[in-house]
Amino acid sequence: MTVPATDSWPAPIRVPAGTTAAAAVRDAGLPGRGAPDAVVVVRDASGTLRDLSWVPDTDAEVVPVAANTDEGRSVIRHSAAHVLAQAVQELFPQAKLGIGPPITDGFYYDFDVPEPFTPEDLDKLEKRMRQIVKEGQLFSRRVYESKEQARAELAGEPYKLELVDDKSGDPDIMEVGGDELTAYDNLNPRTRERVWGDLCRGPHIPTTRHIPAFKLTRSSAAYWRGDQNNASLQRIYGTAWESQEALDDHLRLIEEAQRRDHRKLGSELDLFSFPDEIGSGLAVFHPRGGVVRRELEEYSRRKHIEAGYEFVNTPHITKAQLFHTSGHLDWYADGMFPPMHLDAEYDDDGTVRKPGQDYYLKPMNCPMHTLIYRSRGRSYRELPLRLFEFGTVYRYEKSGVVHGLTRARGFTMDDSHIFCTREQLHGELASLLRFVLELLGDYGLTDFYLELSTKDPDKFVGSDEMWEQATTSLADVAAESGLELVPDPGGAAFYGPKISVQARDALGRSWQMSTIQVDFNFPERFELEYTASDGTRQRPVMIHRALFGSIERFFGILTEHYAGAFPAWLAPVQAVGIPVADEHVPYLESVAAQLKSHGVRVEVDASDDRMAKKIVHHTAQKVPFMLLAGDRDVAAGAVSFRFGDRTQINGVPRDSAVDAIVKWIADRENSVPSAELVKVSSGE
């Protein structure tokens, strides 16, 4: 049977009992090694991925998995991690193995070694990996007869022994899982002798030659199993793809992402910094960054007012009891900063006259918003009640995961909590999702999909019935939006299911943006009520919603999305006057005054630098509009536009230039201005 290769392929194929999956794939005429869509594993009827060497006991229908799919790439990367580990133990025989899973766009492996790996070490390891790949070693699955056999074989690998004993634990550990303990041996293709092996549940590609293209990218320190109380290991990262072309494309993307890194641009553009004296994950915004942040907030504030939100403010710290009531201290304590014990009073001899109490920095604003709702009686006529706050919160993130503005310890959420009746819930969710998508679009993000996070069976509060009702409401609204919906089983917070709006940036990377979370639980815990139309007391439904997620994170994402070249309406400096010579400065200052009268953020560069150097500097600073003026411009009452793409419009009457800039900013154009896009009449 031959299966045509189409966008929807591969169709299921049959593997006869006693036959390898590889033979069935070959008989079906599906692509083999060397093709980007080569079949690397198959998926059986239970959803389990199987090696191509798998032989079913009875006839089985399987779905071939191609190398150029997410699942196929994951298998290739997992196999590449094994090749890396083999190379490390050959070149560094004292190395002890940690874990080596595939990750998004790549893989890593952790090693216990005496010294950190150097760039030269990575070059040597990559060279040895290429030799192993060229050898075509076979990946061979082997089942341990018992834990005792596994322990005996792995006696020299302490981290693997820990995984053997924790076999039923973490499902994300690639080494163990399922009903069996298994190893994968790398076999010499000629002699079939074992060359190297690793504790692993698989699956793997047939041979090392099925790794078409790979590269080691970097190394770093990492704690064993991500716990800072455990041993510090050395982690080597790499990436592997279905073709050299795909690898090259990915490496170019990495290079571009590094160029756009918001931490790098934040320093180069004088936007923000992270002083050591303040602490990890705590940013300070410089004047220019403060302008961008203010514009982000002010536009959002205006839109929220138009949409019927009421603004509130709450303190940064609160008594511990509030977080006992909310459940945060039961379910979220690890993400909170330690308590401050305050208000105790003592006699002169040290005897406690008045006991103190614990206060916490708030990790979330929602408990305080419930208190605002509860501060007086509420009627159904007041609902939906939409409370909104730019509220600064503090979360204890481990230092190893803090990452610039996108993963911080202190940040400001654009936090809203909506209280409505159950009858209003569906309509409120639908209008809320529309509002979120429209507002994100105003900032230039337009490529979205949705993620539905559902209950973690081991970490939730409230009844199953409440969770089911909330999940159904969110799923219905998501379906009505027409956007792709990706399930996230068990990914919800402890108090309710949520929809996350995922946005793709200019590089195609996905970022979690807005979250919309239904909560029947908080109204119960805080005993929130309203008087219904029939006079009875009813519980409202609560919706948690953060549109940006946090101002800081959104700032970082937009910085990378625009590569620092913010739209003119957000740019810290919207226009700059660049004189040909000093005598042209007064004229440009008069043009700047005209622009300032319209609210434009404009500067005139009166420095001693030559004009060409000024243009280079302000181009690097991503100023949207550069206005040049020399003798002819002054005589004609004109300016010349210069843009970041090096295009230019000469001899534009100053009033026309001012009008064009003011209109561009007022229209909130998100594209980069250029001679092609800016509509002005030239005086020449």
UniProtKB/Swiss-Prot annotation:
Ranges for domain TGS: 1-66
Binding positions for Zn(2+) per the UniProt entry: 366, 417, 544
Keywords tagged on the record: Aminoacyl-tRNA synthetase, ATP-binding, Cytoplasm, Ligase, Metal-binding, Nucleotide-binding, Protein biosynthesis, RNA-binding, tRNA-binding, Zinc
Keyword tRNA-binding: yes
Molecular-function GO terms, alphabetical: ATP binding; metal ion binding; threonine-tRNA ligase activity; tRNA binding
EC assignment: 6.1.1.3
Recorded superkingdom: Bacteria
Catalytic activity, as annotated: tRNA(Thr) + L-threonine + ATP = L-threonyl-tRNA(Thr) + AMP + diphosphate + H(+)
Keyword Ligase appears in the UniProt entry: yes
Matching InterPro entries: aa-tRNA-synt_IIb (IPR002314), aa-tRNA-synth_II (IPR006195), aa-tRNA-synth_II/BPL/LPL (IPR045864), Anticodon-bd (IPR004154), Anticodon-bd_dom_sf (IPR036621), TGS (IPR004095), Thr-tRNA-ligase_IIa (IPR002320), Thr/Ala-tRNA-synth_IIc_edit (IPR018163)
Pfam families per the UniProt record, alphabetical: HGTP_anticodon (PF03129), tRNA-synt_2b (PF00587), tRNA_SAD (PF07973)
SMART domains per UniProt: tRNA_SAD (SM00863)
Cellular localisation: Cytoplasm
Record's subunit section: Homodimer.
Function: Catalyzes the attachment of threonine to tRNA(Thr) in a two-step reaction: L-threonine is first activated by ATP to form Thr-AMP and then transferred to the acceptor end of tRNA(Thr). Also edits incorrectly charged L-seryl-tRNA(Thr).
Protein name: Threonine--tRNA ligase
Organism whose genome encodes this protein: Mycobacterium avium (strain 104)
